[in-house]
């Protein structure tokens, strides 16, 4: 990290507050060893059990980027889950993302639900946030994704 983040704070050892937050809040729960495998297996078992008799046992949000694409593949092919793929089209989809979603959903034999946000409304909201000059200009889009 560097000082391009105007609110960053470095301690006497040169370690930034973002790194300290990671060490304090994330790292204690980040198990990349057998413990993590057991925790994942337990969670997947609970998901499967809750999904017995249902068409889907989970929902996966997919943008078409590498992270959500890999998660979708992993859930279906490696973990044996039956996800419904959910995509929010807020007007910013690249053709590459759309192609990735279609190829992965078709290739894995999954169902896709796409929620299309009114582009005119989203554009006006994002423009208002941009003109206001405040932080977090992606707030309207983020709210649509998590609503």
What are these regions (language model features)?
Residues 1-147:
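ATP-dependent adenylation/nucleotidyltransferase module used to activate substrates
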């Amino acid at each position: 990290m560097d000082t391009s983040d105007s609110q960053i704070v470095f301690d006497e050892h040169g370690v930034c507050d973002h790194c300290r937050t990671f060490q304090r809040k994330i790292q204690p729960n980040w198990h990349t060893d057998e413990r993590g495998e057991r925790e994942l297996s337990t969670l997947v078992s609970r998901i499967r059990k809750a999904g017995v008799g249902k068409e889907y046992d989970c929902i996966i949000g997919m943008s078409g980027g590498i992270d959500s694409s890999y998660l979708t593949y992993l859930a279906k092919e490696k973990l044996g889950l039956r996800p419904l793929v959910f995509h929010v089209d807020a007007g910013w989809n690249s053709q590459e993302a759309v192609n990735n979603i279609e190829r992965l959903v078709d290739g894995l034999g999954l169902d896709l639900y796409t929620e299309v946000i009114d582009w005119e409304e989203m554009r006006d909201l994002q423009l208002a946030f941009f003109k206001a000059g405040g932080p977090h200009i992606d707030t309207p889009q983020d709210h649509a994704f998590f609503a």
